[in-house]
Amino acid sequence: MECAVYDTYVTKKDGRVMHFDVIVEPSTPHEKAIEYGKEYLKDSGQDGQTMTQEECQFCHVQEAPKVVEDSIQQNGYFIQKMEGCP
């Protein structure tokens, strides 16, 4: 399964930067990827932080590893935590 990767940088409430990828099916609208990112922010205690197309930008399409594919099929998305994530 191919997946679309949205590279995301959000300023946390403490001023530090949170870097993560929102990974979805390639046909998923950009706006929906942003919604998924906001859901992750809420779950991470960062609800209300700014997340727009500026913070969440399309990066590339790649083959999804099994764990990513399973998450996308169950939840519609997968979050790949990079830096500053809980």
Where in the sequence are the language-model features?
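Generic structural hydrophobic/aromatic packing signal, biased to beta-strands
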Residues: Y6-T8, V22, G37, I79
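Short, flexible N-terminal segments of the mature chain
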Residues: M18-D43
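Short, charged/polar N-terminal "headpieces" of proteins
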Residues: M1-M18
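Acidic, low-complexity intrinsically disordered segments
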Residues: Y36-P86
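Residue-identity detector for threonine
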Residues: T8-T11, T28, T50-T52
